[in-house]
Amino acid sequence: MATINQLVRKPRVKKVVKSNVPALEACPQKRGVCTRVYTTTPKKPNSALRKVCRIRLTNGYEVTSYIGGEGHNLQEHSVVLIRGGRVKDLPGVRYHTVRGALDCAGVKDRKQGRSKYGVKRPKS
């Protein structure tokens, strides 16, 4: 425990909280343009071809974003919305594309967990 005299000479330093999603700049989502759409492989022990895209955001940042769901319609110059949220087995991927917003279509034939994939309620 520091004495009052020590605290007068040198006050306590606040811890700086580092953001996990710096490119969002404290916004819930950001818009951007796809510069490259490709697949990449996850870290061990997983094996797949994960769909990701490189995005130039409106604030000038260039980030890599994961495209969730089965199948997508994104290509170069597509305008997309991204949100925070990393992909644990893809190093360097800290953002998700929002399905069903702007140029990114919702997942086709999705019946459950629809809100996460931008799908409207089906006509029963």
From Swiss-Prot:
GO molecular function: rRNA binding; structural constituent of ribosome; tRNA binding
Pfam families: Ribosom_S12_S23
Modified residues (3-methylthioaspartic acid): D89
UniProt keyword annotations, A-Z: Methylation, Ribonucleoprotein, Ribosomal protein, RNA-binding, rRNA-binding, tRNA-binding
GO biological process: translation
Gene Ontology CC entries for this record: small ribosomal subunit
Source domain of life: Bacteria
InterPro entries: NA-bd_OB-fold, Ribosomal_uS12, Ribosomal_uS12_bac
Role description: With S4 and S5 plays an important role in translational accuracy. Interacts with and stabilizes bases of the 16S rRNA that are involved in tRNA selection in the A site and with the mRNA backbone. Located at the interface of the 30S and 50S subunits, it traverses the body of the 30S subunit contacting proteins on the other side and probably holding the rRNA structure together. The combined cluster of proteins S8, S12 and S17 appears to hold together the shoulder and platform of the 30S subunit.
Similarity field: Belongs to the universal ribosomal protein uS12 family.
Summary of subunit composition and partner proteins: Part of the 30S ribosomal subunit. Contacts proteins S8 and S17. May interact with IF1 in the 30S initiation complex.
Protein name (database record): Small ribosomal subunit protein uS12
